[in-house]
Amino acid sequence: MLAKIALSAATFAIDRPYSYRVPAQLENLLEPGMRVLVPFGKGNRSSEGLVLSLEQAEETHRLKEIQTLLDRRPVLTPEGIQLALWMRERFFCTVYAAALTMLPTGLWYVLKEGYALAPGVDRETWEAKTAGHPRARQVMTLLHGAGGRADLAQIRAIPDGKDPRGVLRELEKAGLVVRETQARRKVKDKTEQIASLAVDPAEALARMEPRRKTAPMGYEVTSLLCNLGSASVKELCYFTGASHQTVKSLEKRGILRLQEREVFRHQLPDIQQTQPLSPLNEAQQAAYEGLRALMNGGKPEAALLYGVTGSGKTQVYLHLIEQTLAAGRGAIVMVPEIALTPSLLQLFLTHFGRQVAVLHSCLSTGERYDEWKRVRDGQASVVIGTRSAVFAPLADVGLMILDEEQESSYQSESMVRYHAREVAKFRCTHHKGLLLLGSATPAVESRYAAEMGQYHLFTLRQRYNAHQMPKVRLVDMKQELRQGNATGLSGLLREELEENLRRGEQSILFLNRRGNSRMVVCSQCGEVPTCPRCSVHLTYHSANGRLMCHYCGHSQPLPELCPHCYGRLQFVGMGTQKLQEALEESYPGVEIMRMDADTITATQSHEVLLDRFRWKQVPILLGTQKIGRAHV
């Protein structure tokens, strides 16, 4: 048997399925979608690979053999393999890179190369064979002293400054050492020990009764298990005060048995009872009926839901998802910003409970891996997340929604430069599902596709419950400057803020530029400090007194004078930090909360800030696009 494998070591130019011989012990274990370690290239260095297909073949003796099986079950379905092959052609990446993009980082492997003494090689043998070769003897001495094996990094640390690979190749040819590669996964499955009675409850208590006084903790544990049936060892020790040794002794006596149970790291709020959906108005109902007909048509469809802000597109989404779940299928909802996820998640949990999973980059590696497993194992049928949620391993996708589909954040800028909309089209085609693009300001290409009939167009022209659109007033800041107001706060804005404060109402200020000043410029020569890596203008941050690049993260101290002509530096433009300072000066004693990339750092801290704004009634919230789309 041979396997067609996509390799991580292959560049795009040589990326193709490579054939490898399947060893006899793996023939009944290996499946497409599993990862393996294989030798690759002239040096036969170990490389990760993804099994694309298996074939029966007799003439396989000339093929290299698979070294190790890394997965116990496939990490990609047949659909996932097809998607990886399609992404290679569409986004010019390798198949393995596409596969890694689909998987949570907790499933990625880290390979560590090392060398060990060959079997049967003793000290006398290698000393004789390395006589006259001091460098080789150094390596062998290190291996011998390390217990017979050392990582390549340890061997490189030998203090002579030379690359040891040449010597290692010679030692390998001489049969003195063998190369080994260890694969370690970034995150392991989290488990806990569960205790349950191994005998009838009456028998267990009868056996512990004679030891009730001499072993009271053992009796307490047994009594508790008689009432509960089973419990984690951690809970047993907590509620009874027993030690782990007590539980172990009960296991040895055959009174209870211990088993490992998988637990999930990310615990969503437990919704005891879900709420029914709100009724739709006439326009929403018309859009819903049309979209439902497309979804139930049995063929892939794409639609654009073009609705003004506040028209109730989310309610249409919820009713469509309810219909999808009723048909036994799954739904994926993508939002452009992580800040949108908490409020949307709470709304979905209220209606769909534990069927909901969340996938975004603010989860820890372990939490994201566990949520991915819940989706893969069918424990969740509704996935909410940012761009990467498009790869959620739902078995049957009936509906995929891209909210605010025009946003640039759906385009990846990392290793595989995919667009979530393109991937969603592929998946909906495969599953014969509905792709729904929602927006108040659709992308030009999406609106054009709708007008040309490539997408079905549905429109919501009125706000929900006939609410009026807010009035917009434009203020000429140049005129404000002529009148002597250089603060960045217009007279009208000050009046409205003061009126809101007087009424005890909250205000939200949106400024899509973080930092203190947009840029720093020399008043004499006009020189502007730029990033040495990206050549973009650096932004001044007053919190740390440094110039920072918002593209790559480069940071440097603010010079006192222009480095070119020693002229005086001027600060041009206003960022959120400077606006916060102006507000604090204008309204002393008033709490002003800032929400931008500089204040959102810890896991889910955007949720903490939004909750604090909601429940503690912070008077003024200032921020960038982090609040521009948040449900505050």
Q: What are these model-predicted stretches?
A:
Residues 364-375, 600-623:
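Conserved helicase ATPase core of P-loop NTP-dependent helicases/translocases
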Residues 427, 436, 445-449, 454-523:
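Conserved interdomain linker/interface between the two RecA-like ATPase lobes of SF2 helicase motors
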Residues 1-439, 446, 451-467:
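Accessory, non-ATPase domains that flank or precede helicase/AAA+ motor cores in DNA-metabolism machines
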Residues 627-632:
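Conserved small/polar residues in nucleotide/adenosyl-binding loops
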Residues 332, 352-363, 532-533, 539, ...:
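Conserved RecA-like helicase motor-core motifs
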